[in-house]
From Swiss-Prot:
<keyword id="KW-0472">Membrane</keyword>
<keyword id="KW-0675">Receptor</keyword>
<keyword id="KW-1133">Transmembrane helix</keyword>
<dbReference type="InterPro" id="IPR017452">
    <property type="entry name" value="GPCR_Rhodpsn_7TM"/>
</dbReference>
<feature type="topological domain" description="Extracellular">
    <location>
        <begin position="257"/>
        <end position="267"/>
    </location>
</feature>
<comment type="similarity">
    <text>Belongs to the G-protein coupled receptor 1 family.</text>
</comment>
<feature type="topological domain" description="Cytoplasmic">
    <location>
        <begin position="218"/>
        <end position="233"/>
    </location>
</feature>
<keyword id="KW-0297">G-protein coupled receptor</keyword>
<keyword id="KW-1015">Disulfide bond</keyword>
<feature type="topological domain" description="Extracellular">
    <location>
        <begin position="1"/>
        <end position="23"/>
    </location>
</feature>
<dbReference type="GO" id="GO:0005886">
    <property type="term" value="C:plasma membrane"/>
</dbReference>
<feature type="transmembrane region" description="Helical; Name=6">
    <location>
        <begin position="234"/>
        <end position="256"/>
    </location>
</feature>
<keyword id="KW-0325">Glycoprotein</keyword>
<feature type="transmembrane region" description="Helical; Name=4">
    <location>
        <begin position="138"/>
        <end position="156"/>
    </location>
</feature>
<dbReference type="GO" id="GO:0004984">
    <property type="term" value="F:olfactory receptor activity"/>
</dbReference>
<keyword id="KW-1003">Cell membrane</keyword>
<feature type="topological domain" description="Extracellular">
    <location>
        <begin position="78"/>
        <end position="98"/>
    </location>
</feature>
Length: 309
């Protein structure tokens, strides 16, 4: 790869060229990142310590919360450190590494949301067989499959980019190593490669998003036979899941289901996908979930009791 590349590092222009405004953005990112870590870790601790949250849904939610922390950690800390150090450069290897990790966690998230939708489908449409179908072994295999699938997706993206020569310019009009930005900087024809990227990322996002929407439609239609209380509980859970699905997939589809061109709004979509959504997910899952809120209250009471001793 070194023989093909004259470029050894890239310059990231960030969200804005206004230094003072960029400092404000970084401060906001810091607050949001800390909130993301604390919120998601609180959910993980609550689920692990609560005996009432032992269903597969909460098992998957634990991994989704951990994933949100890791996904957000790919972007936010570097943006904050770059601002403090006044450094806006990233090496070619660092750029490709960041790209791989972004798509790895993103791919895992997509598959995990699909698994969670299937879990809700079985719980609502086949309640008598739920414990058999969603056994601990099956749940572990599904989570493992999500991580393997995410790794394969990211590896394909990395292999696409690994062979591209970069000979200048080396300026990326973004705050992260964006896939399409890199393709536009390549000193070779990337038309075919752009189509492959769209197929690997864009088509995958659209296909899975449509499958998820269809799944939740089937689930909602099956609620007619439920009691009013059961219907309300199922609707509350499904609406939370569906909100997270929309927040995750809409930016993904916008960013990758299109020709290899860049737009100013790409930065806002990247902020939404990597910083805002991981922060909102815990709030969405807990605000309408009585079981989680009850478990959090019990956990808080335990902490107060320990602190009082």
């Amino acid at each position: 790869m070194e023989n093909q590349n004259n470029v050894t590092e890239f310059i990231l222009l960030g969200l804005t060229e206004n230094l003072e405004l960029w400092k404000i953005f970084s401060a906001v990112f810091l607050v949001m990142y800390v909130a993301t870590v604390l919120e998601n870790l609180l959910i993980v601790v609550t689920i692990i310590t609560s005996q009432s949250l032992r269903s597969p849904m909460y098992f998957f939610l634990t991994f989704l919360s951990l994933l949100d922390v890791m996904f957000s950690s790919v972007v936010a800390p570097k943006v904050i450190v770059d601002t403090l150090s006044k450094s806006t450069t990233i090496s070619l290897k660092g750029c490709l590494t960041q790209l791989f990790v972004e798509h790895f966690f993103g791919g895992v998230g997509i598959i995990l949301l699909t698994v969670m939708a299937y879990d809700r489908y079985v719980a609502i449409c086949k309640p008598l067989h739920y414990t058999i179908i969603m056994s601990p072994r099956v749940c572990c295999l599904m989570v493992g499959g999500a991580w393997v699938g995410g790794f394969m997706h990211a590896m394909i993206q990395l292999l696409f980019m690994y062979q591209i020569p970069f000979c200048g310019p080396n300026i990326i009009d973004h705050f992260i190593c964006d896939l399409f930005q890199l393709l536009t900087l390549a000193c070779t024809d990337t038309h075919i490669l752009g189509l492959l990227v769209t197929l690997n990322s864009g088509m995958m996002c659209v296909a899975i998003f449509l499958i998820l929407i269809a799944s939740y439609t089937v689930i909602l239609c099956s609620l007619k036979s439920y009691s009013s209380k059961g219907r309300h509980k199922a609707l509350s859970t499904c609406s939370s899941h569906l909100t997270v699905v929309v927040l995750f997939f809409v930016p993904c589809i916008f960013l990758y289901m299109r020709p290899v061109v860049t737009h100013p709004i790409d930065k806002a979509m990247a902020v939404s996908d990597s910083i805002i959504t991981p922060m909102l997910n815990p709030l969405i899952y807990t605000l309408r979930n009585a079981e989680v809120k009850s478990a959090m209250k019990k956990l808080w009471m335990k902490w107060e009791a320990l602190a009082g001793k």
